[in-house]
Every structure is written in structure tokens, then in C-alpha cells.
Amino acid sequence: MPQPQQHTADYSSAAYEAQLQQKLIRLNQDFASFNLPEISVFRSPEKHFRMRTEFRIWHERGTAMYVMFSQTDKRPYPIREFPIGSERINQLMPELMALVNRHECLRHKLFQVEFLTSLSNQALITLVYHKPLDEEWISAATDLRKQLNVEIIGRSRKQKILLERDHIIECLKVNGREYRYQQVEGSFTQPNARVCEQMLSWAQEQTRHTGGDLLELYCGNGNFTLPLAQNFDRVLATEISKTSVDSALYNSRLNQVENLQIARMSSEEFTQAMDGVREFNRLKHISLNDYRFSTIFVDPPRAGLDPATCHLAQRFDNIVYISCNPETLKDNLQTLTQTHQICTFAAFDQFPYTHHLECGVLLQRR
């Protein structure tokens, strides 16, 4: 393996603040035409903020090691510590690799390792292989699970071996109340738990005195749904992923949220249902006419809202928009501000030391 140059990433308070200020300068420049109110800024911990990550595995002289690949020449370099990873990830990394290297059946053709951890100190490790997994592997992985006190999943082509659970439980504090979430292996979860808590608290505050009913699109595992539900009479949420819908229903029961209904459908399909263009069997148990929606909450993928969903949002008095891509947010705001005004704007440093910045916007009808 080529010997990489010594990586001397700076995770000091000064370095963190410098990178954040650069992102905020760019954000203000990009949104200058909207005459934004003062931006509320929510900072991340400087280290140990990332709750999930994955590493490729490099094999050399009978030893496996974690590697990443240089962005310049694509060469692998070993990862011996991971300061942005959670403390639990950093604890597990050397312990796991030491045990893997002691057992040929665990090490042989191991291709990738994925970590999922929580603030409640739970952990799930997925081991991905380029070989079929057999009874010998199951026996060794079962011992590994007990020694590390983690959940273990084995994956290879057309094969998934679940030893016990395929999820962990995360506990997030939102304005003084604790919410528990099932986080399933392979499904989307917010990577920065401390910033996620701030995002949930912010969204809850924006809707505290709104009342009426809430429509949420792209609800995922109910991440925002559960804290928001206490501010509304009823909540109707949509999500396309079956795994996420199942988790959202599980999480609503776990947190005793009883004013929520979930429909498994895309935002485009829901728009057709609202307009009476199509009828959906998945909505047979829901009477849309019974809802008195005051607010729509959207947390779309990086592509942002499609034009039809943008126009759907304009029908609501209040729009709460969480964006993981300021570029598509800017495009959507060109449409939304034709009928609504921006009341509050927030920046969440979900991904420190990258150019990414998460945003939150509250818009109200003019």
C-alpha cells in the first residue's frame, strides 16, 4: 500500500469556526436577493459528531485494515482514527479489527464495514463480504456480537444474515422532552445527532402556536413527525420507502403519538390525490376532506421539490422547509415567495469540514 502523507486535520475551535463562517458567507451571498431575516445559526460539536460511517477494507500480508481513498490520486490510505466519528465508533474500530484479524472466516474477503451508533451508546455493525457466508461465519460473528456488545449483520451478494436485530434505538432530546427512534440498518438517518436535536427543536418552535392539522411529505422514520405532532390536532405524513414507513409507525407507538396517520406514497402521488386526479388504495383508510390543514412540512431529498409539489405547498398558510441542498432550496424559494414571505431562516452545520450546509425556512402566506 502506498504510504500516505501524514494527515493533520485541524479540529480546533478556531478551525471549526473558520469553516462555518466561510459557509455562512456563501449562504448570505447566494440568498441575497431574498432579503432574508437574520439567520439563526446552529453549530455542531467540533469532533465526534458523526453517528454513522463506512470504511472499505484493505488486505495486506494476511491483515485487514480500514482504508479511505485519496480524492486526488484515488490511492488507499489506512484509517487508524476517525475524529469526526462518534466516540462509540472510535472505540469499536480497533476492537472490531483486532477480533476480525484473529478469525480467518471473519477476515477472508471482508470488503466493507459499516457502523451505525446512537447517543444512547447502542451500535450496529454491518460486515460486507465478497463471498457466501456459512455456518462457520455465523458462529464466529455470534461470538463477535457478544464480545463487542453490538448488533451484527453480515451481507454478501444476494445474502443478508441477521444475528439478532437489524436496528438500534436512538434517544434525542427536543426542547426538554426525550424521543426514541428505531433506526434500521441501511435506511436513512440523520448522521449528526446533536445537530439533529437542534433541527427538531427549531422546527417544533416554528409551529408551536400554529394549530390546525399538519401535512408532512418525506417523513422518513418519523424524525420530525413525532416532535411536531404535539403542536397539531392531527398529522398526515407521507413516505415512499416501506422500511421507513414501518419505522415511523413503530416510532409513533414507541413515543405514544396517537394523532398521526401515514400513507405510503410519493409527494407526486399525494398531489394527484389532493387534486382528485387519481384515487389510491393506499388512501382508502384516510379521508382527506376531514383534514383542516394549516401547515405543510417538507424535508425533500437533494433534488428539492418538484414543480407540482411546490405549487401544492403554496396552498398552505404555513410552510416549514428543511433543505439539505441550498441550491435547490433557492430555486424552490423563487416559486414559494410569490405567495409566501420568509419569516425565519436557520442554518444547521450538519456536515462540518465540508461545503454542505443544512437550512430551515418558515414561510407564511402574504
Swiss-Prot record:
PROSITE patterns: SAM_MT_RNA_M5U (PS51687), TRMA_1 (PS01230), TRMA_2 (PS01231). It catalyses: uridine(54) in tRNA + S-adenosyl-L-methionine = 5-methyluridine(54) in tRNA + S-adenosyl-L-homocysteine + H(+); uridine(341) in tmRNA + S-adenosyl-L-methionine = 5-methyluridine(341) in tmRNA + S-adenosyl-L-homocysteine + H(+). Keywords: Methyltransferase, S-adenosyl-L-methionine, Transferase, tRNA processing. InterPro entries: MeTrfase_TrmA_AS, MeTrfase_TrmA_CS, SAM-dependent_MTases_sf, TrmA_MeTrfase, U5_MeTrfase_fam. S-adenosyl-L-methionine binds at residues 190, 218, 223, 239, 299. The active site is at 324 (nucleophile), 358 (proton acceptor). Dual-specificity methyltransferase that catalyzes the formation of 5-methyluridine at position 54 (m5U54) in all tRNAs, and that of position 341 (m5U341) in tmRNA (transfer-mRNA). This is tRNA/tmRNA (uracil-C(5))-methyltransferase. It comes from Cellvibrio japonicus (strain Ueda107).
